[in-house]
Amino acid sequence: QIDWDGLILSIQSDKVDCAIAGMSITSERMQSVDFSDPYYKANIVAVVAGDGPYADVVNLTDLKGATLTSSLNTVWYDVLDQVTDYATKDAALDTFASMVSAVHAGKIDGFTCDMPSAKSILMTNPDLKIIDFEGGTGFEVSDEETDLGIACKKGDTELVDKINEVLAGLSQEDRDAMMDEAVAAQPASN
């Protein structure tokens, strides 16, 4: 397993051929690696204490007074800038385990991540709750921020083309089932 911050370097140095790691296809990352077509759209959600004051929020403004965080160098942390008029964006934490511990200890009220990560976290922390903002009540994000792609070495069009060929044959139902399988196989432990 390679740490998140080392994924792109591992691709560039030929340590791995590609990374399938929930990586959003951002223009910044595209300067360093090439991406496949999107394989999944990962909505950004909040994870809060199931019995806490924010367990029943339905839109962002319901987070008034909350202290929130996420992982540094992620879209999840960046979207917290959208709530700083009424909530606190706390210092980023390194792992999901540290975020979960911070919620349990009352140091933060919640954190943001994508839906697959949130589902994985709840498998081992059923006392938490996912807030899935729907119908325009959540974070404003672009496809660039939520479309996940497979990162490959810059210029490796042959590999990207092969990956895209496989992806083109997968229905949305197939993709959802594969993501659910992946989440079930590896509950978030960090």
Say what each PLM segment does.
Residues 1-62, 135-143:
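Acidic, polar ligand-binding/catalytic clefts
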Residues 1-9, 55, 91-105, 116, ...:
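Short helix-initiation/N-cap motifs at beta->coil->alpha
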Residues 6, 21-32, 79-82, 109-144:
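A ligand-binding cleft/hinge motif common to bilobed small-molecule-binding domains
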Residues 11-12, 63, 103-104, 163:
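Hydrophobic residues within well-ordered alpha-helices
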Residues 41-48, 124-167, 184-190:
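Periplasmic-binding protein-like
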Residues 51-59, 91, 155-161:
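Short helix-loop capping/hinge motifs at secondary-structure junctions, enriched
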Residues 58-74:
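Short loop->beta-strand "edge-of-pocket" segments that line small-molecule binding or catalytic clefts
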Residues 75-93, 130-134, 161-190:
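Ligand-binding clefts/hinges and TM-proximal coupling segments of bilobed small-molecule sensing domains
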